[in-house]
């Protein structure tokens, strides 16, 4: 989901200590958790977490985990419709604004402001309606990805999703480095905490007293450091794993990759704005998605920025479709339903 991006952006409000938690948490907690869950599933024939709980903890625990898993997976799937629909709506309005010819494609900020003010419509639809349309499209995709075999949809489009994710990660690193070296508009790494002493590296920079570093930092940045949701997805990957030797790269390595993405966006949060209060103001004005959009457009231009934002969009989409799919499999296994044909 958007956790490895939105979480680190919010976590940046606590200062550079957020990056320390991402590194330590990812290596010693998140990746270990994912590898452990994945290997449990691999060595039990791709069994789901409820089945594993039943095997090792008994039938009552299995029944409880079944209900809990289905409820939480459905909630996750629903939640991961809103954020990609919002970003896709913004992209659509801005692209149509540039295509209309009335606004220069090089002036991404002007396009965005006009679209937000309602000065741009898409086939007569304002931005709110466009977001609703994208919500419907994403839901339809989720249904198809849930019902059809993995190789029919998920297996075919995920390579493109992966390419967008790679472009987003490399592009934002390039943007940070090039901005740091720029003479026209320099943006130094961690400029919001530049010149601090070593002791202050562990200081809580969050100004609101009701948001202490412990334990809220660890709740703010979960995906990218440690995510229990990954345990529900392990069986999907375990059933596609041909050899146990692949497990370390698939389960442990994937979490390390997620941690790198989290570090990139935490660095954006610490660097893009002049100060942490400015970052907080941007988040209040439009949620972390505003930070994602504004920084991507600034570093990579309208076209490159849109591709970077699409790299962000694929994260909640790939979590939403697999969440619904995992819920379907849990229900089918619980009721011993045959899953060999589409009708079933």
Positions of predicted regions on the chain:
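Hydrophobic alpha-helical segments and their helix-loop junctions in multi-pass secondary transporters
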Residues: 77-98, 104-108, 132-133, 145-146, ...
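Selective recognition of specific alpha-helical transmembrane segments in multi-pass small-molecule
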Residues: 69, 73-78, 162-179, 227, ...
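Membrane-helix boundary/coupling elements in multi-pass transport proteins
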Residues: 3-9, 45, 72-87, 219-240, ...
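Hydrophobic, small-residue-rich membrane helices and short re-entrant helix-turn-helix hairpins
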Residues: 49, 148-162, 229-262, 278-292, ...
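Flexible loop linkers connecting adjacent transmembrane helices
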Residues: 7-11, 16, 32-61, 96, ...
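Loop-to-transmembrane helix boundary motifs in multi-pass membrane proteins
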Residues: 59-66, 70-71, 128-137, 253-263, ...
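Extracellular/periplasmic helix-exit of transmembrane alpha-helices
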Residues: 176-200, 254-294
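Transmembrane alpha-helical segments of multi-pass small-molecule transport proteins
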Residues: 65-72, 92-149, 165-168, 339-344
């Amino acid at each position: 989901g958007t956790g490895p991006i939105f979480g680190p952006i919010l976590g940046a409000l606590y200062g550079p200590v957020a990056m320390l938690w991402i590194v330590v948490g990812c290596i010693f907690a998140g990746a270990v958790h994912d590898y452990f869950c994945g290997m449990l599933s691999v060595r039990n024939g791709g069994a789901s977490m409820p089945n594993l709980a039943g095997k090792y903890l008994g039938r009552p625990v299995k029944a409880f985990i079944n209900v809990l898993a289905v409820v939480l997976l459905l909630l996750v799937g629903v939640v991961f419709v809103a954020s990609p629909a919002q970003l896709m709506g913004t992209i659509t309005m801005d692209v149509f604004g540039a295509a209309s010819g009335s606004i220069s494609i090089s002036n991404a900020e002007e396009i965005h402001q006009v679209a937000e003010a309602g000065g741009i419509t898409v086939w007569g639809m304002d931005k709110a309606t466009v977001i609703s349309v994208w919500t419907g499209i994403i839901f339809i995709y989720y249904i198809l990805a849930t019902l059809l075999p993995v190789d029919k949809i998920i297996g075919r489009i995920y390579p493109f999703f992966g390419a967008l994710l790679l472009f987003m990660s490399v592009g934002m690193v390039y943007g940070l480095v090039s901005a740091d070296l720029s003479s026209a508009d320099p943006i130094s790494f961690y400029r919001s905490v530049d010149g601090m002493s070593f002791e202050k590296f562990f200081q809580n920079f969050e100004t609101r007293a009701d948001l202490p570093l412990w334990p809220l930092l660890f709740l703010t940045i979960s995906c990218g450091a440690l995510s229990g949701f990954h345990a529900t997805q392990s069986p999907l990957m375990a059933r596609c794993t041909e050899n146990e030797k692949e497990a370390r790269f698939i389960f442990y390595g994937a979490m390390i990759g997620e941690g790198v993405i989290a570090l990139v966006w935490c660095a954006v949060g610490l660097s893009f704005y002049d100060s942490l209060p400015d970052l907080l103001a941007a988040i209040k004005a439009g949620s972390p998605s505003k930070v994602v959009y504004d920084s991507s457009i600034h570093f990579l231009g309208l076209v490159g920025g849109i591709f970077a934002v699409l790299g962000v969009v694929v994260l909640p989409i790939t979590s939403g479709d697999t969440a619904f799919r995992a819920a379907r499999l849990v229900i089918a296994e619980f009721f011993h339903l045959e899953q060999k044909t589409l009708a079933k």
